[in-house]
């Protein structure tokens, strides 16, 4: 920008950097679509000229005649198949039909045939249901057998999948088994006899200086020994070991082993109690004579 002492107009002219319309830009013809319009008009004119001369009508007649012939051939083939089906099936023939309710194939017998409508009435074997079917939709009797085999295979596969899922769930939840063992152990603890009374309790007044030197009672058995089933007992602790189950045939090896271990435990319990009682009596006599 010139900083001179002249008039203001020369300063404004010197400060202008760009003026529209004064120069020729390289991209001035970007929006010029004159050539495109001319090409479109030329194509439309040539199409109209060909249409007037009849060149396009001949080409258009050829594809029109082709689809008319194909449906005619298809209809003939369909009629041949339907006629063959009508000749094949007779009243009383065994067949297989698709029941409209569930879409499955069932064995059936043809009760009547309508040759005009090309339909028939079938009676499903073993069910007695009647249904109208197209003759062309009837299947051979072996189709029902094959369908039943596939259904049975699918049902067996579903059952095996369910049993596999149940076994996996039982393996993943061991807490339920431990809870069952604990509940059985708790119920059996109420049936165990009480610990033997100390010397002097129920046997007359206790004498000074006497001590019970007999073997202590055995500890309670582990919970897994108490998991076997035994019949219920009346209220109160039993004096003798409980009898074995009434129906031993219904028990497995684990239950039989549990019953045997319980019997051993109870036998040792009462044996220790008896030995302690005898030793207490013997020591009491010795101290009495001394």
UniProtKB/Swiss-Prot annotation:
Region annotation P1 (binding site for GEMIN2): where it falls in the sequence: 10-41
UniProt keyword annotation of Cytoplasm present: yes
CC terms in the record's Gene Ontology section: Cajal body; COPI-coated vesicle; cytoplasm; cytosol; Gemini of Cajal bodies; Golgi apparatus; growth cone; nucleoplasm
Region feature Disordered, mapped onto this chain: 1-29, 54-85, 151-219
Location (main, coarse): nucleus
Domain Tudor: start-end pairs: 88-148
Ranges for region Required for interaction with RPP20/POP7: 94-207
Biological process (GO), any one: spliceosomal snRNP assembly
Region (P2 (binding site for SM B)): 237-264
Segments of skewed composition (Polar residues): 170-190
Chain residue ranges for the region called Required for interaction with SYNCRIP: 276-290
Residues that bear Phosphoserine: 25, 28
Protein function: The SMN complex catalyzes the assembly of small nuclear ribonucleoproteins (snRNPs), the building blocks of the spliceosome, and thereby plays an important role in the splicing of cellular pre-mRNAs. Most spliceosomal snRNPs contain a common set of Sm proteins SNRPB, SNRPD1, SNRPD2, SNRPD3, SNRPE, SNRPF and SNRPG that assemble in a heptameric protein ring on the Sm site of the small nuclear RNA to form the core snRNP (Sm core).
Subunit structure: Homooligomer; may form higher order homooligomers in the dimer to octamer range. Part of the core SMN complex that contains SMN1, GEMIN2/SIP1, DDX20/GEMIN3, GEMIN4, GEMIN5, GEMIN6, GEMIN7, GEMIN8 and STRAP/UNRIP. Part of the SMN-Sm complex that contains SMN1, GEMIN2/SIP1, DDX20/GEMIN3, GEMIN4, GEMIN5, GEMIN6, GEMIN7, GEMIN8, STRAP/UNRIP and the Sm proteins SNRPB, SNRPD1, SNRPD2, SNRPD3, SNRPE, SNRPF and SNRPG. Component of an import snRNP complex composed of KPNB1, RNUT1, SMN1 and ZNF259.
Protein name, UniProt field: Survival of motor neuron protein
Organism: Felis catus
Lineage: Eukaryota, Metazoa, Chordata, Craniata, Vertebrata
